[in-house]
Amino acid sequence: MQNIQCEAIVLGVMDYGEADKIVTLFTLEHGKLKGLARSAKKSRKRFGGALEPFARLRLHLAMKVGLSTLNGADIVTIFPHIRQDLVKIGHAAYACELVERLVPEAEQNHRLFRLLAAYLDHLDQFQHDPSDRRFFEANLLKVVGYQPALSRCAACDADLAGALVLRWSPSSAGVLCGRCGKTGRPIASQTVALLNRAMDTGRFGLIRFSPTELEEAGELLNAAISCHLSRPLKSLAFLREIGV
């Protein structure tokens, strides 16, 4: 057992027995891990309000394979403005659940940690914009290695630059040329260009989709994400319930 300190974002929390909690964390230094917080339900002195979903923490833990032990936590930020807005809460929960479901345990990924932290920070500071969700999804897929083919045909590898007709299908790994995607769903070249720009741009708030582009990008990204999930996302159902 190794005693360490690390920076982490809380992905999820569940009760364990009468007094304890099991916390799923995404850490900068060690990737995703689960930690047991003893007596977290009975006493707030040890952890205060730190063990809340999508809080950013500095952790003290005894690390071991399977289930680590949380010995203490210092709050970096709880993203207070997110917690005052139901739509922002839904999107923060969605981002954290995506990371939890798509990332294996104990696999360090600095880029993904920074992406998630940047999205939560942007949600906290600015009014929610649907384009930011698509920006996060596109970059998440890129960082974890599930990026859909956007510049070349996913079927024949033809260069899509200047193509007049572009399509995609849920069974494809990206966008198809006119010859390969005769029965696929149409997608505008401008939508594809914006998705490519989103993955080349390092900051939230710089890419904005029109309503039509949002719909097209959303359909493609949702399909690209869904094929890597074994069951539906609870947070996505919540977003639909609140009309987002």
Swiss-Prot record:
<dbReference type="InterPro" id="IPR003717">
    <property type="entry name" value="RecO"/>
</dbReference>
<comment type="similarity">
    <text>Belongs to the RecO family.</text>
</comment>
<dbReference type="InterPro" id="IPR012340">
    <property type="entry name" value="NA-bd_OB-fold"/>
</dbReference>
<comment type="function">
    <text>Involved in DNA repair and RecF pathway recombination.</text>
</comment>
<dbReference type="Pfam" id="PF11967">
    <property type="entry name" value="RecO_N"/>
</dbReference>
<dbReference type="GO" id="GO:0006302">
    <property type="term" value="P:double-strand break repair"/>
</dbReference>
<dbReference type="GO" id="GO:0043590">
    <property type="term" value="C:bacterial nucleoid"/>
</dbReference>
<keyword id="KW-0233">DNA recombination</keyword>
<keyword id="KW-0234">DNA repair</keyword>
<dbReference type="Pfam" id="PF02565">
    <property type="entry name" value="RecO_C"/>
</dbReference>
<dbReference type="InterPro" id="IPR022572">
    <property type="entry name" value="DNA_rep/recomb_RecO_N"/>
</dbReference>
<protein>
    <recommendedName>
        <fullName>DNA repair protein RecO</fullName>
    </recommendedName>
</protein>
<keyword id="KW-0227">DNA damage</keyword>
<dbReference type="GO" id="GO:0006310">
    <property type="term" value="P:DNA recombination"/>
</dbReference>
<dbReference type="InterPro" id="IPR037278">
    <property type="entry name" value="ARFGAP/RecO"/>
</dbReference>
<dbReference type="InterPro" id="IPR042242">
    <property type="entry name" value="RecO_C"/>
</dbReference>
